[in-house]
Amino acid sequence: MPAAFGFTRLGKAGGPKQTDPNHRMYDVAIVSSAEIAKHYAEGFGLSDDKVLATGIPRTDIFMDPQYAQTVQDGFYAKYPQLRDKRIILFAPTFRGNGQMSAYYPADAFHVDEFMEALPADTALLIKYHPFCPERPVIPEGYKDRVLDLSDEDELNDLLFVTDLLITDYSSVVFEASLLDIPMLFYAFDLFDYISKRDFYYDFESFVPGKIVFSQRELTEAIVAGDFESEKVPPFKTKFFDHLDGRSSRRVADLILRFIGEKK
């Protein structure tokens, strides 16, 4: 959620109209922290008191060691050739104004150049945004270590086997921070992207990792181990009020309370 959405994007391409109902009919919306509640209130067109920092149920899995082990066992059973590899997950968001125009520029990331620059124990998982129809070109010589999982495997589950995340403006950074995963932000089109979408925070001070602007800078940072990972813990603390794995319980209690009030 670093990028602006909903009513924050009034007047922007792909943004809503002032008269659109969108999310305004919600009785309540739940968020991960008080820090971001104001942004969701603005984006959804809700009053501040309708946005509650209960924590997000889907993040409970990141505090569940048994779930993590089950996912890891299943992944390596499915892809045994990756068991002893250093796994890099490339998960960029889409460009364009929405699902109908979404794309990821083919010339932004070249698998062959990326893999040639890194050690032989490196494996790459590619997970494009569901809106993107494009698929990466994977050279034959790398198909044992480079997997396009855009059409399979849940993104959050892939984080449990990830040693390094490469992304850009995607909200996956929030979930990745819960596992203290090192991150690199490949923002080759940062200024153009900002001009079209805007952000709730200054991107360069917001992200919990090093920003790179070219594929060469990207591989150089990986080889050097230069991820600026010290930014991850304060990021996690800022954007998650609850790290106890009990957000589902809080939301369930909230729903039951609402049901009782409606009777």
PLM features: residue spans?
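Active-site and donor-binding regions of nucleotide-sugar-utilizing enzymes
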Residues: 1-65
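Acidic, amphipathic alpha-helical patches
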Residues: 19, 111, 155
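A short beta-strand/loop micro-motif in the catalytic core of glycosyltransferases
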Residues: 27-33, 124-125, 165-166
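Helix N-cap/beta->alpha junction signal
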Residues: 32-35, 128-130, 169, 214
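Conserved catalytic-core segment of nucleotide-activated headgroup transferases in glycan assembly
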Residues: 58-138, 212
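Donor nucleotide-activated moiety binding/catalytic core segment of transferases
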Residues: 125, 130-174
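Catalytic binding pocket for nucleotide-activated donors in carbohydrate/polymer assembly enzymes
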Residues: 139, 171-239
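C-terminal alpha-helical cap of glycosyltransferases
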Residues: 244-263
